[in-house]
Amino acid sequence: MDLQHQTFHNKGCDIHYWHKSSSSADYVIFLHGAGCDHRMFASQLPIFGESYNVLLWDARGHGLSKLQHNQTFSFEDMIDDFLKLCEKYQIANAILIGQSMGGNLAQEILFRKPNLVSKLILIDCTRNTGKLTLSEKLMLKLSKPIFYCYPWQTLIRQSAEACGNDEAVKAYVRNCLAQMKKKDFIDVMMSLMTCLREDEAYRFPKPVLLLCGEDDRSGNIRKIVAPWADSDANCTLLMIEKAGHNANQDNPTAVNKAIASFLTTP
């Protein structure tokens, strides 16, 4: 796929993104997970061929989209980046595909701007509006000091092990994280918590495909994904075998088949 590498500036950061135009008015936008970059979706691009305009980015603080010295990652700034990108291309409606952090961002966009989204595909991410247990709330409060207790190289290695089953996926995650500073990674993880708000009555107003690796060991994702799907008539869940947290990289064949099928449903 012929992707054009471009940038735009917003809130003190040069955001790098990749764009493919088509004759169609339909857009698909890929949103990667924390610590990763746009390359994680390489195996999903062939699904869309010439039928869609495609956008991928390196979110602020990730990949080529470097934060300036003493600048702190903000989930709210990332939302603003996304909306600026949509404004730039006059996108009125898009399919959002988000993995982990990207899935949290996609949920937040649907919550704030429902008319901007036609469908969501959420890969290995938690529910923004889910109810947390007391132990989960405690772990969130303790996570920052726990992260700082770990040497950065240990944190990189353990994060990579948690993300993938496949050795190539683990190597990719290590490569991505090695380009970040420890403080920046922790800032990202802490800022993600700002999108969590308990609202058990909330239901998605658009069709949503939930994909979860059967071996996902990240947070509460594997535990909550089935009850999440059961509670929302607009959600379709598929567990991906032989896949961890980065299910789209561990088992792209199964993920691509699920996405292609979902795209054809009303």
Language-model-detected regions and their locations in the chain:
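Flexible "cap/lid" loop of the alpha/beta hydrolase fold
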Residues: 107-111, 118-147
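Alpha/beta-hydrolase fold catalytic core
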Residues: 1-29, 51-52, 92, 260-266
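Conserved alpha/beta-hydrolase catalytic His-Asp/Glu region
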Residues: 131-133, 149-203
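Gly/Ala-rich beta-loop-alpha elbow adjacent to hydrolase catalytic centers
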Residues: 98, 102, 106
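Active-site loop/oxyanion-hole signature of alpha/beta-hydrolase fold enzymes
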Residues: 55-97, 257
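Conserved loop-alpha-helix segment in the C-terminal half of the alpha/beta-hydrolase fold
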Residues: 209-243
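Conserved HGGG/HGGXW glycine-rich cap/lid loop of the alpha/beta-hydrolase fold
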Residues: 13-67
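Catalytic histidine-centered segment of alpha/beta-hydrolase-like enzymes
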Residues: 243-252, 256
